[in-house]
């Protein structure tokens, strides 16, 4: 958490294996290797310059063999491009709860998987319309039309 909050990509590199597989709902496919994870961190911090992680109270942590589950929350204000896919900054603040699953090898994270509600984040940022809104109903109409034309 400190590596993220300090924007310290070198500290992150020390926590993960060279062949890390990093899966996050914000990524279209897992990041593989230290440089890819560092770039994901940089891109996340460009999109959310005040991005911060915290622990719930009480902390949520479970360890079984080489697997660690860790609960957290993340918050930040969308002030830079969100890549991928390239959403323009909305200036809106988001906060979401989530947890990580780490598979450890030789004291470092070899496989990382984050779990959080990306749709909730998109709604908070105004990228996806609120449930029941006119915009959502319009998207439903467009999706149905696309499905009908695509058959």
Where are the language model's segments positioned?
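C-terminal and inter-domain tail/linker signature
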Residues: 1-151
